Design a protein with these regions (language model features):
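N-terminal helical hairpins
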Residues: 1-9, 25-26, 41-123
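Short amphipathic beta-strand and strand-loop transition segments with alternating hydrophobic
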Residues: 15-24
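Hydrophobic alpha-helical membrane-insertion signals
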Residues: 28-30
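Short strand-coil-strand connectors
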Residues: 36-38
């Protein structure tokens, strides 16, 4: 097997969870989650919006300031999404095949909302 093919196989099997702004050119943007698994990428909004100038692109978190104290709450929510995504990845690693987008987000939502009283209302 040549180097490029071997490298591609290794990269394909790397899992990653990160966050990004859907509209970084605007003044306020929605935050989205991006999860990659077995070469497939899953992305969608997490229904949180922030002023773009408060986004720390290196840390993938909101800058907390005296003027924007709700940044702590949003960062806690991002951490909760990240943990749910890692649990979801663990669930699908048993099967070795990347799930469909709908299957992936069904399990992710179940992991994220499992401590909530009600079920999620949006997909």
């Amino acid at each position: 097997m040549d180097y490029n093919r071997a490298r591609a196989n290794v990269l394909k099997n790397v899992s990653m969870v990160t966050f990004f702004l859907l509209n970084p050119e605007r003044e306020v943007s929605t935050i989205a989650i991006l999860v990659s698994f077995n070469g497939k990428k899953y992305r969608r909004s997490i229904h949180e919006s922030i002023p773009v100038n408060l986004w720390n692109n290196d840390k993938k978190r909101v800058r907390v300031s005296a003027k924007y104290q709700q940044g702590n709450i949003i960062n806690d929510t991002l951490s909760k999404w990240e943990v749910a995504a890692l649990r979801t990845l663990s669930h699908f690693k048993e099967y070795y095949n990347a799930p469909s987008k709908d299957e992936f987000f069904e399990v992710l939502d179940r992991e994220f909302y499992k401590d909530e009283v009600g079920e999620p209302t949006q997909k």
